[in-house]
């Protein structure tokens, strides 16, 4: 049955090719395919129509966007004012439109709380945790976590997280939520990605060249240097890094033979994945990494370290090899 659905998110593509919140956009597309009337409430500015959904852009004064809210707020603390303004305006917009049968809030903070609780109490409430938002929630004082959890439960909210690791962490931090939790990785969309041959042709890569690809934010937690050091020990292998971050210049200096492509639009990133012989990840802090799922969906082998749900995935996927750094 078709329903009017509100999707609240602090991350959503503002233009074609924008990688921010692409997994939320995939959720919206799934709702649209099911015949629902979808309204997205997101920070920033852009087109008011996206793939058939109505988008309500809300002022945030630069608080949200790439490379993520926490990084942006840490970089410039005055952006907290913009984050507060987004919460107030999004809550107001939700209150004004009380005809949604269903509200889907992505990111536990600030969308599931406090924004989603300001909508019509008759709306079905679905809350989705993705990663850093869940870990931030788990670090809140116990009394605050309990208060928020009880508010969600009082509304009959259904909670979904994208990995078993996140479910375990959330259940341990707030046991009262355990019975309401489900695990489901975010949908991914690789339908328009070119074949390996076409991707290599577009990127100017010969069929005989072996390419190892790393995709991600260049921060210490991702351990890109560890991955590049391991790749440097292999002969006749071209290493490519897609992504940006504070470690970029030091990595360039340390690994001069590596091609650093920088931060790319999502279609270009997916083209690189399709063209690669292997995707490599040395990050030990992952739940259900989208880039690994995208690579496997495109038939690209993955070498990674044991982290999050990768351990369970590797048991049933011979194309996912886990190694432990020595």
Predicted region positions:
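Nucleotide-activated donor-binding/catalytic signature segment of Leloir-type glycosyltransferases, i.e.
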Residues: 249-267
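Aromatic "clamp/platform" in nucleotide-sugar-dependent glycosyltransferases that forms part
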Residues: 284
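A short helix/loop element that forms part of the nucleotide-sugar donor recognition site in Leloir-type
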Residues: 143, 193-205
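Short hydrophobic beta-strand element within catalytic cores of glycosyltransferases
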Residues: 301-304
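N-terminal subdomain of nucleotide-sugar transferases
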Residues: 1-57, 232
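Short alpha-helical donor nucleotide-sugar binding micro-motif in glycosyltransferases
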Residues: 263, 271-276
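Conserved donor-binding/catalytic core segment of Leloir-type glycosyltransferases
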Residues: 160, 206-222, 228-232
